[in-house]
UniProtKB/Swiss-Prot annotation:
Pfam families: SecB
Function, as annotated: One of the proteins required for the normal export of preproteins out of the cell cytoplasm. It is a molecular chaperone that binds to a subset of precursor proteins, maintaining them in a translocation-competent state. It also specifically binds to its receptor SecA.
GO biological process, one term: protein tetramerization
Name of the protein described by the UniProt record: Protein-export protein SecB
Family membership noted in the UniProt record: Belongs to the SecB family.
GO MF annotations in UniProt: unfolded protein binding
Record note on quaternary structure: Homotetramer, a dimer of dimers. One homotetramer interacts with 1 SecA dimer.
NCBIfam families from the UniProt entry: PRK05751.1-3 (NF004392), secB (TIGR00809)
C-alpha cells in the first residue's frame, strides 16, 4: 500500500486512538450557599488530588479513568467540593509490550486532562465562584511516583 505521494505506508508504527471520552461520575457541592458566595474572608485554601486508573477491555483496548477531586475552603468553612471521574477508551496498536503501561498511564490521561479540567472549571463557575483553572499535570512524574510506591510495597511485603 502507498500514500498519495507514492511512498509506502508504515503499518507497524505505534498508534494511539481515542475511541470515546465520557463523564463516568461527577458531583459538585456548594454546601454553604448562598453565604459562601460573597466576598471571601481570606485567601481560599484549594486542595486537589489527581489519580489515574486503567483496565484492559479487549486486546489493544483500554479504559483509562482520570479522577480529580478537591475543593476550596476559607478558615475551615467549605466553599465548594467536587469529585470527577472522567474516562476514555483508547486503542493502542503496535506499541511494544514494555511501553504499554507508560503509554496507558501517561499519554492517555494527558489527552483526557484538558477536557476534565474544563468540566471542573465550568462546574465551579456555575456554582457562583471564579472558574478553577487546574494547573497542568506531569503525568510522567505521577507514573514514576506510582511505580516507586508499588516497588516499596513489594519490598515491604517481601520483608514481612
Amino acid at each position: 500500500m502507498a500514500t498519495q505521494n507514492g511512498s509506502p505506508t508504515d503499518n507497524t508504527a505505534p498508534a494511539l486512538n481515542v475511541l470515546v471520552q465520557y463523564i463516568k461520575d461527577f458531583s459538585f457541592e456548594n454546601p454553604n450557599a448562598p453565604r459562601s458566595l460573597g466576598a471571601p474572608q481570606g485567601q481560599p485554601d484549594v486542595n486537589i488530588q489527581i489519580n489515574v486508573n486503567a483496565r484492559p477491555l479487549a486486546p489493544g483496548e483500554f479504559e483509562v479513568e482520570l479522577k480529580i477531586e478537591g475543593g476550596a475552603a476559607v478558615q475551615g468553612n467549605t466553599l465548594f467540593a467536587f469529585d470527577l471521574t472522567y474516562g476514555g477508551i483508547f486503542r493502542l496498536m503496535n506499541v511494544p509490550e514494555q511501553s504499554l503501561q507508560p503509554v496507558v498511564l501517561i499519554e492517555c490521561p494527558r489527552l483526557l486532562f484538558p477536557f476534565a479540567r474544563q468540566i471542573v472549571a465550568d462546574a465551579v463557575r456555575g456554582g457562583g465562584f471564579p472558574p478553577l483553572m487546574i494547573d497542568p499535570v506531569d503525568f510522567a512524574a505521577l507514573y514514576q511516583q506510582r511505580m516507586m510506591a508499588e516497588a516499596q510495597n513489594l519490598q515491604t511485603a517481601g520483608q514481612a
